[in-house]
């Protein structure tokens, strides 16, 4: 290993709590590359593969393979389908996704030509001179490398939203999000941000002679937005709803919860985490809406039915893990905390799958966003005299602190000023304690 790789390997071991929990080992001739891996693990895998005397093979998942920029001689695409995380079923890859993955073979400045082998799913069998590949497979291969790729068919996503609204699909997640994002809009020609009638969807409707139908759909959208606006009188809430995509009514309830807490507000990031979890446990709509993207992971971690809605019991199970994350505990300890809370016994922690889901999915894709909304609501939705009772430095640090895994804004600042690229969260906590014991930090 190079010096940089050794530092990355030390960071990986510190973050996980030992080498036995990692997907990698320094002697690997083949390395994985997937979303369950820590950032430092992926960096190490890429570095090992990049070296001519390093790993010979890198095995990447479908999505991540499209982003790898490594000098591969041969790209083997093990199937043209992938698992859908939401439905749990297999789905076909689009032609451009296969092309992106195939483009990993060869790299400008390193290897002009590369070889790509696509293994279809399911496997095909045919005999020379007797059978021929199915026509749909030939069509897919031709679509991957078209004769003329200069022209693209483009469409306006707004057109899809308007069609769903015209069909009264008001509970569709995309429709709800669009209406929320327009919470502070006025559907006037003078609209400073964006005039829907001058959108690409509007242009296409005019060209196709469907202007009246398009205008009718816009009127339905306008009426839905205005109906939401009539329920909220605080323009600051409407603005935040527009910025975040969260329903203004939900933000209003969160605002009242914050006001109720002003008498004895949380005094640490850990107390803010517990405060937020108590709110999510008590508010079914907030829990369902704000945790929708990570609901499957939360339920998987808690050992409950994966497709069920997030419930208070599931949040109680992951809470110790979140507190352990910000306290600087390694993932093996966080895994044990989650298992203990879920009352699950196991002989081996394996690769700490539950803790990895918490660190790689639930925290960055769910909790970080929610804490960002809390910070914005405190700064923009509470009167100035109310803000004076709160530690605003801590409020501003809530989202990045939970994302990076620190329990104070001071540690967050310490981590951002440290120049060590490979340093992990656990190592930073240890360095902070060391500096404090030496009297270098008050």
Model-identified regions with their sequence ranges:
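C-terminal helicase module of SF1/SF2 nucleic-acid helicases/translocases
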Residues: 104, 111-212
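C-terminal accessory/interaction regions of large nucleic acid-associated machines
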Residues: 8, 168-180, 219-442
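Conserved segment of the helicase C-terminal RecA-like domain
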Residues: 39, 70, 74-84, 89-137
């Amino acid at each position: 290993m190079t010096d940089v790789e050794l530092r990355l390997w030390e960071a990986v071991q510190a973050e996980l709590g030992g080498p036995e929990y990692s997907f990698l080992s320094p002697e690997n001739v083949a390395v994985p590359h997937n979303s369950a891996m820590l950032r430092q693990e992926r960096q190490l895998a890429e570095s090992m593969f990049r070296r001519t005397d390093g790993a010979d093979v890198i095995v990447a998942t479908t999505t991540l393979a499209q982003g790898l920029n490594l000098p591969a001689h041969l790209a083997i695409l093990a199937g043209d389908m992938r698992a859908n995380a939401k439905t749990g079923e297999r789905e076909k890859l689009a032609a451009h996704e296969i092309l992106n993955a195939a483009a990993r073979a060869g790299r400008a400045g390193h290897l002009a030509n590369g070889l790509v082998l696509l293994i279809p799913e399911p496997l095909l069998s045919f005999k020379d001179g007797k059978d021929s590949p199915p026509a749909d497979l030939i069509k897919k291969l031709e679509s991957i490398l078209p004769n003329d790729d200069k022209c693209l068919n483009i469409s306006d996503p707004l057109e899809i939203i308007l069609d769903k609204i015209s069909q009264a699909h008001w509970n569709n997640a995309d429709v709800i999000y669009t209406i929320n994002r327009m919470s502070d809009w006025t559907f006037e020609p003078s609209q400073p941000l964006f005039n829907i009638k001058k959108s690409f969807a509007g242009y296409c409707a005019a060209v196709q002679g469907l202007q009246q139908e398009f205008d009718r759909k816009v009127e339905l959208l306008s009426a839905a937005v205005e109906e939401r606006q009539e329920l909220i009188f605080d323009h600051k809430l409407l603005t935040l709803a527009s910025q975040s995509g969260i329903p203004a009514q939900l933000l209003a309830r969160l605002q009242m919860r914050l006001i109720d807490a002003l008498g004895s507000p949380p005094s640490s990031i850990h107390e803010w985490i517990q405060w937020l979890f108590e709110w999510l446990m008590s508010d079914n709509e907030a829990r369902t809406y704000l945790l929708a993207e990570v609901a499957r992971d939360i339920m998987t971690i808690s050992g409950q039915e994966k497709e069920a809605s997030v419930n208070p019991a599931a949040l109680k199970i992951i809470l110790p893990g979140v507190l352990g994350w910000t306290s600087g505990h390694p993932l093996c300890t966080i895994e044990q905390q989650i298992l203990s809370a879920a009352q699950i016994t196991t002989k081996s922690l394996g690769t700490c799958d539950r803790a990895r889901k918490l660190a790689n999915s639930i925290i960055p894709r769910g909790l970080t966003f929610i804490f960002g909304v809390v910070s914005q609501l405190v700064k923009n939705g509470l009167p100035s005299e109310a803000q004076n009772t709160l530690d605003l430095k801590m409020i501003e640090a809530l989202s990045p602190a939970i994302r990076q895994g620190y329990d104070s804004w001071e540690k967050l600042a310490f981590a951002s000023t440290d120049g060590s690229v490979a340093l992990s969260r656990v190592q930073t906590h240890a360095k902070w304690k060391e500096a404090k014991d030496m009297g270098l930090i008050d």
